[in-house]
Amino acid sequence: MLDLLRSQGDNRVIKLTQAFKRDLRWFDKFLCDYNGVSMYYHKSVDHTVELDACLEGLGAVWNSHVYHLPIPLHYQNLGIVHLEMVNILVATKTFGPFWAHHKVLIKCDNQAVVQVLVNGRTRDPFLATCARNIWQVAAKFDVELVYQHIHGIHNPIADLLSRWTNHHSDFVKLYTYVDNPIWLNVNIDLLEMDCNI
């Protein structure tokens, strides 16, 4: 919205772009869920989630909760940047109700994805749709999301989960990082996005 308004200068008539209209739909949907109270601006992080995506799957760890989700056929043509963003959406939808009224640090090893979510800007329509869906879930549950880029070498648990094979060695590695992991069955429907916002 703001980019369009800034680019118009002093023109009196502005032709609304599709992106502008999607932003308006986002606000319209948000207002239906909004209860009028916001608890944002927490001083410290309450929860940390680490995520990773690869061409085989998505993985995340939050506290002792973990998941692995194989990439569905209709997403196998996506690049790694898109898969990383989809994984953040899946994590936000999965854990959002548990994070209500808290500040959450999302650690991701993809710098481009972190930049989109921190700056709120991208020219990629798919990334923009994912970002709006992430922000919609965060707004619905009054979650303040902050993002941090971490190098892949510092993200071993999520990396292991994204490449999960159910092999004995995977379980041994996981148990060295997480005591008594709680496996979540992530519903494939969480990959669906509202493309109208």
Model regions: which residues?
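Mobile genetic element proteins and their domesticated derivatives, centered on retroelements
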Residues: 1-2, 27, 50-52, 60, ...
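C-terminal reverse transcriptase regions that engage the nucleic-acid substrate
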Residues: 1-39
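Eukaryotic intrinsically disordered and solvent-exposed regulatory patches
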Residues: 33-37, 46, 91-93, 132-134
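Two-metal-ion RNase H-like nuclease active-site motif
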Residues: 41-55
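An acidic- and aromatic-residue-enriched active-site/binding cleft used to recognize and process polar
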Residues: 53-56, 63-66, 109-111, 150-153
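A short, polar/acidic, helix/strand-boundary loop motif
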Residues: 63-86, 94, 111-128
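RNase H catalytic domain
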Residues: 93-156
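Flexible, low-complexity interdomain linkers flanking nucleic-acid-processing modules
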Residues: 143, 160-197
